[in-house]
Amino acid sequence: MKHIEYKPFFAALLALTVIGMAASVATLGVRADDNEAITFRTRLTGFGEVPPKLVEGSGTFSGELSADGQSMSWTLTWTGLTGPALVAHIHFGQPQNTGMPVVFFCNGGNRPAPCPDGPDHSGTLTGTFTAADVVAVPSQHVTAGDFAGFVKILRAHLGYANIHTMQFMGGEIRGQIRVGRGDEN
């Protein structure tokens, strides 16, 4: 029977794990590579909420980080809500968990109020996020104005967009934001 040396095997495995983790952390940087725009997207539905909601409403969010990493142009759309949108924002939270808002699309922060309400309780908002839009969330160690931190949250897939209504004050539709390049995601 052949004797196997486990120490070198586990040392190599540990080294590969550390290298892999370092590479993963390196991808959480803020800047786009060589002026290539980084996009963030999600589809909002009631199934994304915590707890999930069986509702007809849906929406989309898309954002594009500027080449210098200092701003993000964005569009948020929704339709079919149970009533007018009361507030819409991006939270810092994992899938299946909740967190606090870090930026607002409407009706909070320094965004216009109220949120638009069109036919079938629909709406579209466009704008640009900058450091001035990031609000403090002391319980999650987010500092007001920390745009680089906000982008790190999104790149780590720890941001979600959601829209609240009178019937669903905790949120009617939600989508976890993902990173994509170009038309991906």
Give, region by region, the residue ranges found by the protein language model.
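Bacterial N-terminal signal peptides
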Residues: 12-24
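N-terminal leader/targeting pre-sequences
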Residues: 24-185
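Bacterial N-terminal signal peptides that target proteins for export
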Residues: 2-15
